[in-house]
């Protein structure tokens, strides 16, 4: 959880972790491939989550299957607004939005997450500033 936020119950934490990884994977794949930088960011998140072998197999399956912004957004819409913002921010961090395909993916994800334009811009500024 973010600093100052309470820890989620175990089942919710697992769901949240998978959602964030799914968002990162989908953003990385938006241009048709996952490059070395994107893969290392995803691997770092897996390590942070102390992933086991089953979770690593899940990751490999996710990397092979087609993902789209509708699937990612569907899990977040209707939850706390902060979750949609977190999904978008994690997607921004892993993607290189200079690619036309990744930019198009991010714009569609933001639309499906129903992010207000000002929040979308704030998150993009936050992601660029590191």
Where on the chain are the PLM-derived regions?
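Small-residue-enriched hydrophobic alpha-helices in membranes
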Residues: 1-25, 38-130
């Amino acid at each position: 959880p973010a600093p100052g936020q309470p820890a989620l119950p175990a089942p919710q934490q697992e769901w949240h972790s998978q959602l964030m990884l799914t968002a990162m994977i989908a953003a990385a794949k938006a241009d048709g491939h996952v490059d070395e930088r994107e893969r290392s960011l995803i691997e770092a998140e897996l390590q942070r989550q102390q992933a086991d072998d089953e979770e690593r197999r899940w990751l490999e399956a996710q990397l092979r299957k087609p993902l789209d912004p509708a699937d990612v957004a569907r899990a977040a819409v209707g939850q706390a607004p902060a979750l949609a913002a977190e999904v978008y921010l994690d997607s921004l961090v892993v993607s290189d939005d200079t690619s036309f395909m990744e930019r198009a993916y991010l714009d569609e994800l933001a639309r499906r997450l129903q992010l207000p334009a000002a929040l979308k811009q704030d998150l993009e500024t936050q992601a660029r500033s590191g």
